[in-house]
Amino acid sequence: MRLNTLSPAAGAKSAKKRVGRGIGSGLGKTGGRGVKGAGSRSGGGVRAGFEGGQMPLKIRMPKFGFYSRKGAVTAEVRLSEVAKVEGDVVDLNTLKQAGVITKGMQFAKIVLSGNIDRAVTVRGVSVTKGARAAIEAAGGKIEE
């Protein structure tokens, strides 16, 4: 076997569809595009979700809810990441300096994931019930 003798397996590649080449091909005259309408024209077609003028499903369904913009500037911090912060005080600035959260974050919440084995003081950062218990069990405290 040589590189110049390699070829695809028989039946692996199908021949290109040749449209508009006689009625015997099954794709003659209109070339599989049907008769008249936007889909038959060159460059034609309808956008995704268009239902021929009928009120689209997306608009027929009721509107509900909204996306809170606060979620985009709130970081979720694991307890194991809090342990990486140097110093005894954990606040928004120390979390940013340690590289735990990005500089665009305005709020943070510490969640119980992992463990902490030293006492830290959490200041100005919200904490879940489980994380609060773990921090206090390690000798730390939470200041609102």
From Swiss-Prot:
InterPro entries: Ribosomal_uL15, Ribosomal_uL15/eL18, Ribosomal_uL15/eL18_sf, Ribosomal_uL15_bac-type, Ribosomal_uL15_CS. GO terms for cellular component: cytosolic large ribosomal subunit. It holds the Pfam family Ribosomal_L27A. Keywords: Ribonucleoprotein, Ribosomal protein, RNA-binding, rRNA-binding. Residues 21-50 have a biased composition (Gly residues). Belongs to the universal ribosomal protein uL15 family. NCBIfam families: rplO_bact. Part of the 50S ribosomal subunit. This is Large ribosomal subunit protein uL15.
